[in-house]
């Protein structure tokens, strides 16, 4: 882990040092330099954008100053100041027409990632969260009748589980046991209010199905918990702290 942090430090120092030097280089075409920022005004190489159609400065039909049909100052049909048909100031097609539009709200990606990793907290269930939808597992119950019954009725069984954060449990068995109980209870109550009842066979199969889903949920939570712990260890190492401090110095400076 320390070697990885050192290599990251060397790589970012080299990259940001090069960027820092690029920022300090003078840009061509500045004020009082050899290259003119405004074409046609005394550049050593002549006018980069000569008038079209044979018309000189101040002549009609050739982009003249204040004349029609050529992009004149304040005149139509040529992109004039504040006039239509040419992308003028505040008119259609111009880049400045976007100034007065309200900016779109930005989505907080950190909150989205946290909600996706931890699941949605369910109100009224005392801190239980609802996991993401899963495909119902393929289970064999030991008899052709039960296997066929399961295939025909699996759509009536839960495809999401309720659970608490895994750090509230001492082991996987406790997590799975609590997950199975609360999930079957909530699904049974919700379905019963819709006028549908479950038989003993349904309850038996639901227990098997939900148990497999709760085990899968525990494995997902364990992996996410391990990744969060690894990230904390990585960002708390001295090389990474030094790297972040150096990057902040370059950005601010």
UniProtKB/Swiss-Prot annotation:
Region 5 X 8 AA tandem repeats of P-H-G-G-G-W-G-Q, as annotated, extends over 51-91
Q: What name has this protein been given in UniProt?
A: Major prion protein
Q: Which residues bind Cu(2+) 2?
A: 69-71
- List other remarks: This protein is produced by a bicistronic gene which also produces the alternative prion protein/AltPrP (AC F7VJQ1) from an overlapping reading frame.
Question: What organism does the UniProt record list as the source?
Answer: Homo sapiens (Human)
Main location class: membrane
Impact of changing residue 102 to L on the protein?
A: In GSD and early-onset dementia
Residues holding Cu(2+) 1: 61-63
Q: What SUPFAM superfamilies does the annotation carry?
A: Prion-like
Q: What is the effect of changing residue 178 to N?
A: In FFI and CJD
Cited function: Its primary physiological function is unclear. May play a role in neuronal development and synaptic plasticity. May be required for neuronal myelin sheath maintenance. May promote myelin homeostasis through acting as an agonist for ADGRG6 receptor. May play a role in iron uptake and iron homeostasis. Soluble oligomers are toxic to cultured neuroblastoma cells and induce apoptosis (in vitro). Association with GPC1 (via its heparan sulfate chains) targets PRNP to lipid rafts. Also provides Cu(2+) or Zn(2+) for the ascorbate-mediated GPC1 deaminase degradation of its heparan sulfate side chains.
Report the Pfam families cross-referenced here: Prion, Prion_bPrPp, Prion_octapep
Gene symbol here is PRNP
Q: Where are the sequence repeats?
A: 51-59, 60-67, 68-75, 76-83, 84-91
Residues annotated for lipidation of the kind GPI-anchor amidated serine are 230
Gly residues composition-biased segments:
52-95
According to the record, the residues making up region (Disordered) are: 26-108
